[in-house]
């Protein structure tokens, strides 16, 4: 069952209006999508944060908009760069019977053999794009890295058929790689080369 969040329609106006909203403990937001025109709303910052911590950002929420329930997912969250606060939220209204294309976080599990041997784990991409019905939307996609050795990598092609949802990302989309550590000798050589170039 979706978590219900109460929201209120708001007037679009000056920056001072948005500042006043935030000072009052609310977050300016907008809802758009399935059978709904773009509608400016506000939501309790406390309730939004609590729901995200409990359910995860990739959950389906039910917004109570003036007595009307609207199923949504969080499309975008704008964070304040100086404080750990949410500045604005975009909600996407959805049809529960139709598949969505969304980005889902990658969750690495297991201890890599390569890391145990001194290798360095590199994760160039933190999310995967998937196609899934809202009710089946996962909080994350688990990727087992325990067998990875130094010099080895893992791409979408190697996990595509092990994942319960359809992955849209290309086969060569890199998930994780284990690189060899830089030795003290290599660092000295690199430093001396840089000095010669100077």
Swiss-Prot record:
GO molecular function, a single term: 5S rRNA binding
Keyword Ribosomal protein: yes
InterPro entries recorded: Rbsml_bL25/Gln-tRNA_synth_N, Ribosomal_bL25/Gln-tRNA_synth, Ribosomal_bL25_b-dom, Ribosomal_bL25_C, Ribosomal_bL25_long, Ribosomal_L25_dom, Ribosomal_uL5_bac-type
GO CC, alphabetical: cytosolic large ribosomal subunit
Pfam families: Ribosomal_L25p, Ribosomal_TL5_C
Protein keywords: Ribonucleoprotein, Ribosomal protein, RNA-binding, rRNA-binding
Gene3D superfamilies assigned to the protein according to its UniProt record, in alphabetical order: Ribosomal protein L25, beta domain, Ribosomal Protein L25, Chain P
UniProt keyword Ribosomal protein, yes or no: yes
Any single biological process term in GO: translation
Alphabetical list of SUPFAM superfamilies matching this protein: Ribosomal protein L25-like
Task performed by this protein: This is one of the proteins that binds to the 5S RNA in the ribosome where it forms part of the central protuberance.
Subunit (UniProt): Part of the 50S ribosomal subunit; part of the 5S rRNA/L5/L18/L25 subcomplex. Contacts the 5S rRNA. Binds to the 5S rRNA independently of L5 and L18.
Protein family per UniProt: Belongs to the bacterial ribosomal protein bL25 family. CTC subfamily.
Record PANTHER family: RIBOSOMAL PROTEIN L25/GLN-TRNA SYNTHETASE, ANTI-CODON-BINDING DOMAIN-CONTAINING PROTEIN (PTHR33284), RIBOSOMAL PROTEIN L25_GLN-TRNA SYNTHETASE, ANTI-CODON-BINDING DOMAIN-CONTAINING PROTEIN (PTHR33284:SF1)
Protein name: Large ribosomal subunit protein bL25
Organism: Lysinibacillus sphaericus (strain C3-41)
Phylogenetic lineage: Bacteria, Bacillati, Bacillota, Bacilli, Bacillales
